Amino acid sequence: VPPREIVAIAQRRFTKPVELRRTHPHYENWKPSLYGPAFYETIYMAPSYQLGSLAQGSGGDWRGFSLQVTKNNDSINGLTVTAERPHVIAQSKNLLIWHGSETPQLSVPDAQVERIDGITFLTYDQTWIAVHPFDRGFALEIGDPQTHVGLVPFKRFVTARARLVVDAHRVQYRASNGSTLT
């Protein structure tokens, strides 16, 4: 029988939100050329959603991006990003930048969609997503009742305070709460 702490983690019985950063070994890690981590992963678990990413993006048989949103009826919706070419992902908590060599395709099932000042807002029951598109990617900021009280304040703060800066050498997103991701 595993320790109860391990069972609690497996059943996700812990205080949220929480951010996990972890690495994964190579599948053939006994080979000298495959020393060190194969993947650097960030997972952010909030009460109504889970955002996860791999720093080097998707490729082969792995997905480098995952966003699962819980609906009021306990079903789950997932936002999907599709791109054929290489890309990289930066994530910190509820913020994410997806940057590639082509414009990605986003699939957004069952969300209410609204565009304000070049920002696409996706609304689910208790989760709100601001998508800031740019030429070869996008920045995401995700809100929920814990971070922004409601949808109206979330939209107001994002449109008034958030900033996306894209230049030849970097992409930087300043979130509605002032935190930055580069």
Stretches found by the model and what they are:
Residues 1-182:
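Ser/Thr/Asn(+Pro)-rich, low-complexity disordered segments
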